[in-house]
Each structure stands twice: as structure tokens, then as C-alpha cells.
Swiss-Prot record:
The keyword Cell cycle applies. Residues 85-128 are annotated as: Disordered. Keywords: Cell cycle, Meiosis. InterPro entries: Gti1/Pac2 (IPR018608). The gene is pac2. Disulfide bonds: none annotated. GO terms for cellular component: cytosol; mitotic spindle pole body; nucleus. Coiled coil: none annotated. It comes from the Eukaryota. Residues 102-118 have a biased composition (Polar residues). This is cAMP-independent regulatory protein pac2.
């Protein structure tokens, strides 16, 4: 069920995996994970799913997570020890009205929630905010996982989600999709991922460094230009 093993650092990394799944190079998640599959989640585990294809909007991994934090285009969570208390709408024990999910600047419901069974991807709007009472007794898990979520809607109205797991201690054996030689030939179709914005996809074809033929370099000046171009493409 796992889509990829590696590290996701940028939206481009996520989009490369979306495209690899679209063309059949990598598998998409088709259903919720079983208990056994949840137990196999490790640093480097990456999961991609199509909301309509898998029939699910929210990710289920059975772990407890901290409040979400916005990190660029991603939402980031830290693994917690223990389980949060169930959240209920309506009146609290003293008869006062319980706090309902608050709207964030994007118009989605607040994603700052401790997520036990369901932790959503960045585009989801049905996460529940949690009262301070529910946060008591929860602590960051020593050497616990870090989870990132990323979502995008394609021009064909496919809602795609990505969940990745990493460790606070970097693993040098894990690479990003954008630096993975096995994915270096993937091209991003122009206009398919409009939410990615102009900085990510500006031309009909994503130019990988391997598309540049070294044997066509005519002189040392050309070589210097080529090196600069390659460095820019890897950023």
C-alpha cells in the first residue's frame, strides 16, 4: 500500500509523486490501511491517494498527533504519547457552549487539532479543534515521527492527497523524489496541477538535468553556464 520511500521537502517533490502515480509508475493507496499496514509505517513512508478513487477524505493511521503547524505548503504534525479525549460538540459539563471548529485564513475549519484516528490532509475542512482540557496528559513522543500532509486539486478535478512520515534525526539513505534518479525522467504536464502555481510549472515540460546533453557543450564558457543551470534546476 505504501506509495514511496523517501523524504518530501518541497511541493515539487509531492507533484512528482502525483504524476508518477498517474502514469502508473508508483501505486496509489486504494483503501484505508489495515492494522498490520499501520504498524509498518516508518520514517520515509509516503502515501498518495485520489480522494474519489480511494473513497476517503481523511487519513487514518491510528497514531496521536500534535496540533498542525503550517510549514510552507505543508501541514506538519509531531507524534504524541497517549490518546486524546473524544471531542463532542454541544454543551460542556458546566453547561457552557463548547468551542466549535474555527475558520482559518483560507476558509477551512481549523486544522490545529490533536488527531488520533483521523488526521486530514491540507485541503480538508472537517478537522475538529480541541479544548485545552483534551490536551492534558499528552506529550511529544521521544524520537516520534513527524508527519506532513499536502493536497492539490488537478485541472481534471481530481483531489489528490499525500502523507509523508519522517524522523527528527535525518536518515541520509532517504532521498527526495526530485533527486531520485529513478524518477528523473518524469515530466509534469503543463496545466494539470494548477494549484502548484507558476513557480513550479511554467513550461509544457519539466526540464531535468539529465535532459541536457553534456557532449553538446562547445567550450568552457558553455560548461560554466551548464553547471549554473543544473544547480538552479536542483533547487
Amino acid at each position: 500500500m505504501q506509495t514511496y520511500t523517501g523524504i518530501i521537502k518541497t511541493p515539487l517533490d509531492a507533484i512528482i509523486l502525483f504524476e508518477a502515480c498517474r502514469i502508473g509508475l508508483l501505486p496509489r493507496v486504494q483503501r484505508r490501511l489495515s492494522d498490520h499496514e499501520r504498524s509498518l509505517i516508518r520514517a520515509g513512508s509516503v502515501f498518495v491517494w485520489d480522494e474519489r478513487e480511494a473513497g476517503m477524505r481523511r487519513w487514518t493511521d491510528g497514531k496521536s498527533w500534535s496540533a498542525s503547524r503550517v510549514s510552507g505548503s505543508f501541514l506538519t504534525y509531531r507524534e504524541m504519547e497517549g490518546k486524546r479525549k473524544p471531542y463532542h460538540h454541544g454543551l460542556s459539563t458546566d453547561g457552557s457552549l463548547k468551542r466549535s471548529p474555527s475558520a482559518d485564513t483560507t476558509g477551512n475549519s481549523s486544522l490545529n487539532a490533536y488527531s488520533n484516528e483521523d488526521s486530514g490532509a491540507a485541503s480538508l475542512s472537517d478537522e475538529e479543534s480541541v479544548d485545552d482540557e483534551n490536551l492534558r496528559g499528552l506529550h511529544y513522543k521521544p524520537n516520534g515521527l513527524i508527519k506532513q500532509s499536502f493536497s492539490i486539486t488537478t485541472s481534471l478535478n481530481h483531489k489528490l492527497h499525500l502523507i509523508s512520515y519522517s524522523s527528527p534525526i535525518p536518515d541520509p539513505s532517504l532521498v527526495t523524489p526530485s533527486s531520485d534518479v529513478n524518477l528523473s525522467r518524469i515530466t509534469i504536464p503543463y496545466g494539470l496541477y494548477p494549484d502548484a502555481g507558476p513557480p513550479l510549472v511554467q513550461a509544457p515540460k519539466f526540464l531535468a538535468p539529465y535532459d541536457i546533453l553534456v557532449e553538446k557543450v562547445a567550450c568552457s564558457e558553455d560548461a560554466r553556464v551548464l553547471d549554473k543551470l543544473r544547480q538552479a534546476l536542483w533547487l
